[in-house]
């Protein structure tokens, strides 16, 4: 089934819920939505939303939650870990499989595909999608990394993505 976590943070949040509801009805996919309260509790808004979202995942009875993180997300996570610290575990970024709790596993099947590859596939297959407008806000460090820093690294260093991903794989297996 599909699970939509409604954070209520964007003025478009209700529209996203409607989009997911209609798409799942059209594709005959069982659908469930969970509205969460994002409590900052000393966290930034992104971290607080992630905490609420993962709690909703943990409460879902499906056992396996598949997420759409892709290679670009993985590279951003690695680079952010490099500048924030956190050691080897943080630099290993996101594993393809991770135990969330005793009953729930997180699965990231798209980590080997770039955002561009996924966008091309979606366009070729006429798959509808939505984009969270907050992803364009470079006030968030991850977005600044995505739109400002990483393009410079990619221009300067041949095969940058391939090298970073090789390091991530090495860190995950060590």
Can you annotate each of these PLM segments?
Residues 1-148:
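Core alpha/beta nucleotide-donor-binding catalytic domains of modification enzymes
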Residues 139-174:
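ATP/NTP-dependent adenylation/nucleotidyl-transfer catalytic domains that generate, transfer
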């Amino acid at each position: 089934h599909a699970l939509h976590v409604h954070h209520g943070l964007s003025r478009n949040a209700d529209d996203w819920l409607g989009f997911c509801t209609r798409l799942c009805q059209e594709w005959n996919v069982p659908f469930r939505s969970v509205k969460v309260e994002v409590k900052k509790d000393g966290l930034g808004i992104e971290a607080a939303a992630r905490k609420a979202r993962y709690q909703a995942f943990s409460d879902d009875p499906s056992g396996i939650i598949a997420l759409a993180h892709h290679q670009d997300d993985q590279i951003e996570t690695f680079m952010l870990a490099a500048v924030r610290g956190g050691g080897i575990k943080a630099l290993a970024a996101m594993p393809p499989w991770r135990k969330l709790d005793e009953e729930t596993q997180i699965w990231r099947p798209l980590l080997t595909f770039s955002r561009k590859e996924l966008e091309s596939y979606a366009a070729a297959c006429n798959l509808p999608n939505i984009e969270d407008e907050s992803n364009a806000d470079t006030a968030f460090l991850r977005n600044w990394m995505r739109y400002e820093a990483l393009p410079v690294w990619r221009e300067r260093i041949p095969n940058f993505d391939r090298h970073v991903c090789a390091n991530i794989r090495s860190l995950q297996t060590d």
